[in-house]
Amino acid sequence: MTEGVIWKEILFFAIPLILGNLFQQLYNTVDSIIVGNYVGSNALAAVGSSGAIINLLIGFCIGASTGAGVVISQFYGAKNTEGVRKAVHTTMAIALVAGVLLTVIGITVTPSMLRLMGTPDKVFEQSVIYLQVYFGGSLFSVVYNMSAGVLNAVGNSRRSLVYLMIAAISNIFLDLIMVVGLKLGIVGAALATDISQLISCIFIWGFLIRSEDVYKLKIKEIRCYDHLLSKIIRIGIPTGIQNIVISLSNLIVQTSVNSFGATVMAGFAAYIKIDGFNILPVLSISMAATTFAGQNIGARKPDRVRKGMYISTVMGAGYSVLTGIMLLIFAPQVIGVFTTNQKVVEYGVYIMRYFCPFYWMLGILHVLGGTIRGTGKTMQAMVVFLVSLCGFRVMWIAGTMAWTRSLGHVMMCYPPSWLLGMLLMLLYVWKGKWMDL
């Protein structure tokens, strides 16, 4: 990515990432569609409320993946093959340890977290079951995502897309077999996700082991190289903390939503699944910007980094505008895919129409943040995200719930936080020393 036409390099790298994330969102959404239609709206609410906890616990692992990706992309851009080799094997060691820890912690804390969230009794048991089965397979998810991060860091986003497509198709068939055919209910949905993640994990590790490129994986060489571990942690921890704290703020929002009952929870769950089809492509463009910036920082090409930031920001904002318009127009039809319960559909549409007009701000915020992380300035990006997407939301919810119990007021914590984050990020780009090499 250090040579060639910038917009083509970013776009052609981002497209497989976008398709991959859409496929990943697809098999998460299929869980909800099948559960909502074949198990019931309470089960849909259980799956939806589980999402906040899943995001909370995997956030730190995503941070580690970001740190590894920045380190690998900078080594790759500088043509430091030994650095790439050591960073890849350190990344895999982190993935294995993090995956095991996530499994144990996730299964253990699930009941307590759901109680803290005020999950209604009629969906509590199903939420516990779904989450604990899901976390049973979290090792596969962590290993796959960090392995895909290695491929993305060296510019090979197409290969991970193929394996994710296989996993998505497998998940759909497994959902139909386990939920519809075997009548395993919410357990079947979680098992289908676990097995599909295992399939993608096997495929991507097989490719890395067979590869003859600089990122070839050798099982016997998996270990933590101290100097690289500290560098990955130094870059990754701010992103991990950012993800965890933002997930905590979303957990607080989910807790507020739970207080309105299972029907509202189901409507919110349906919206969140659809929202993924906007945010995940934006995050894919952000990841492309991170890799582009990392490789060109390694190659000592700051002007190319700056131009790449402008181009990728236009891409992210443009995509968000298009999806926002489409979802505003087709909101009832889209939410109606998840359930036949008309009240749930009404709440889902109500929530969706609060957010869609403001998606473009989220696009700008995330893509600028991705570029800044690629230069290694993850601490600065973390501060912007924490102030806006966490601090502001928590204060808004605290004030809103003390003043009035209105679903609309709760939902309105999101757009102003996106505006604040976008403005702070633009200010940092304009005045900050983010391009210092």
Which functions belong to the PLM regions below?
Residues 56-59, 171-175, 201-205, 277-280, ...:
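Hydrophobic transmembrane alpha-helices of multi-pass small-molecule transporters
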